[in-house]
Swiss-Prot record:
Keywords: Chaperone, Cytoplasm, Nickel, Nickel insertion. Involved in urease metallocenter assembly. Binds nickel. Probably functions as a nickel donor during metallocenter assembly. Pfam families: UreE_C, UreE_N. The gene is ureE. This is Urease accessory protein UreE. Gene3D superfamilies: Urease metallochaperone UreE, N-terminal domain, UreE, C-terminal domain.
Amino acid sequence: MLVIHTRIAPQAAADAELELTFEARRKSRLRCFTTAGEEVGLFLERGQPALADGEFLQAKDGRIVRVRAKAEPLLHVTCASPFELMRAAYHLGNRHVALQLGDGWLRLPDDYVLKAMLEQLGATVEAVQAPYQPEQGAYGGGHHHSHHGDEEFNYGPRLHQFGVRK
């Protein structure tokens, strides 16, 4: 089993690739397989942002592993005007839906209820299979509700590191 604990800076080449859905890339502990079929155990630091498409990891044996976002069922949303697209994003955000933002479009996980809502708002909604890389949000630490005695799970907010969008 390839055991991975470490995220590293971008590399020129990789020894293996992991192709993972967004939900899998959010996990700090995961059993998965490389694209070549080798078993992998991910043991990453908890409370960190999801693995991004193109991110690199280093296995305990020194091998370099590239992460690829796996195509998954999404809704691709466009609108007749920027205002209507902004309105659609507002209503999705009001429902705490993670969104991937593009120039003139939004993407979100396929959901028939949200699709119907978007169509009622006048949006054009198309089902697609594509890699999913939603925005991390302004605080990047996720959504937590700690209770008495759960202090070790109360991760404080961290300002998002805004990067260049592709």
